[in-house]
Amino acid sequence: MMTQGRTACRWHIRAGENETKEIPAFFRRHSVTDGLARILMRRGLDTEDKLSHFLYDDLSDLSDPFLMKGMKEGVTRLLSAIDRKEKIVVYGDYDVDGITSTSILVRCLKGMGADVGYYIPRRETEGYGLNEKALLSLRKEGYTLLITVDCGISSAKLIARKPEGLDIIVTDHHTPPEQLPACIAVINPHQKDCPYPYKELAGCGVAFMVARALHLSRDGVDFTDNVELAALGTIADVVSLTGENRILVREGMKRFLTTSIKGLSSLLIASGIVHEDTKAITHADQVSFGLAPRLNAAGRIAHAKEGVQLMTTESSEEAERLASQLCDTNVTRQQIERNIFEEAQKRIAELAIEKDMALVVDGQDWHPGVIGIVASRILEIYHRPVLVLTVRDGVGKGSCRSIPAFNIYEALAAQKDLLLQYGGHKMAAGFSIEADKIPEFRKRLNAYAKARLTPEDCIPVLEVEECLPLSDVSIDFIHSLDLLEPCGCDNPKPIFATRQAFVETARRIGQDRRHFKCQLSAGKELIDAIFWGVGDIDPCRAGDVVDLVFEPEVHEWYGEHVQLICRDIREENEKLLSRDLLVDIYKKLTVFLKDQPRPVKEVQSCLMTQGGFEKVSLSMGLAVFEELELLSRFSRNGEEFYQRRIATKKLDLMESEVYRKHRMF
């Protein structure tokens, strides 16, 4: 019997019953298997032209960088500064996107003979983006041209007060506010009237386009050096891995093993991603889980300039030292993160906000470098918008993570009268606020969220490609999926479901026993299945028959074998409810109870015999109607009766706990 307490997820099977079984011949011409072809067609790649772009587009297929609004003006000013030997400073951000953006332009400008430096604010004391003190200091150091990367789009007021003699170019990819900075140039594909066709570039992608434009203008050559850094930053910033981002990431990762960027090479080795047997790096999650956290650790715990130093040094010895240092810093970050996560959970209980539609969690002197990660971990538990703030000297600095149904940037904008500063995207943002305004902010944000979110929005959805028998999950099948790489946002790794899998063995694994491993029958074979971070609850027991959702992988340990990374699991005999089933039950129920109340046993018996409903599903359906107050139960002479009730408001099935728990995916 399966244990209780696991998180409920909704499984959305993308393969519909009416899905065409015929695979167009052009897929075979490109050596695409039928299984992969079905996945690609579901993702809209249903013509040979679309497939060819997906499989073969390279750096030569990138758009003309001068299509980007502001590019011509920005490049003209940069080239003038280079020719006149002006001091140029690249002003970046402290995350991986900011570090790689800064490194791309520093390496490019140095290569063109520029007198260039860089500046990245300290996360802990300066916060995100431009600040007045930094601008004044940079001007005193003799800089006459400042170019931002991955920041600046929301700094119109500050730029209007810039020091005399300091020109500014803004390059960014964040959502532009109504008022744009008045400066030499604003380069951001999201700004109005920007004709650049691809809008989803990360900050490093925009910086890479600036580098291309500089060389096209000066040398007439399309410059593609440093695309490795664009790949790293694009993956780390979790932007869409489609179109030009897919090109940057795929082409950049191809160069990882032969890169001339000493810091990147050293970090690949120090992180364990590259060793003597490594033949290629094709999976984006190797970067997102292996490289990005280590580079991010610099900006979170130490100073992000260490990351830029690593990616711009020409010394192999310095590169090895800095890479090792970042790995040590990452270990420190992990411990700080664990401590704050535990404190945040206690704070949620203390505030009694577990049922809030948006969780606003504040703590005194929490390390600002890890609150974004903590917010992400809390979101995984509660599946609703999470805002984590650290309070120091009367000011709270917050990091936000959201769910697809809730635009957190718009939510912050709606409360901007309470905020000192804010910025970000639909799914992630940052802000600052006076500490005494946090309770009012929590109250207003929850009212805003409650008006826009339904209970259904707060239940995670697993987008499952299709249901497969385990016997179909072969090593060859898994290798065929590699053509999808790089996978990430908008091009996810495919996950699959299987039904009626028999659990042969089940046990805890790992030093802290937080993980779980079982073996599932697949015909004559046994397949290993792993559950990461299950906590105190065993997902299943030996002897269970289960349905599960999994990501397949080839595990290389004494040879290749199939392993499943499990995402969710259900007992095979769970009786699940669908909207159609409930509508059918309700129609027959209203006829049966039209004139008068009837005994519960009589209602159930008649609906089973006349309606053909299975007993357990029928019982669950009737329980849903009771929870929604469409049906009431009362006793008369020791017998239970049902009475129909008239709905007085628009009904939402997700308000029923029984439906949420047992609904059909």
List PLM regions with ranges.
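Generic detector of well-ordered alpha-helical packing
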Residues: 94-98, 151, 173-174, 189, ...
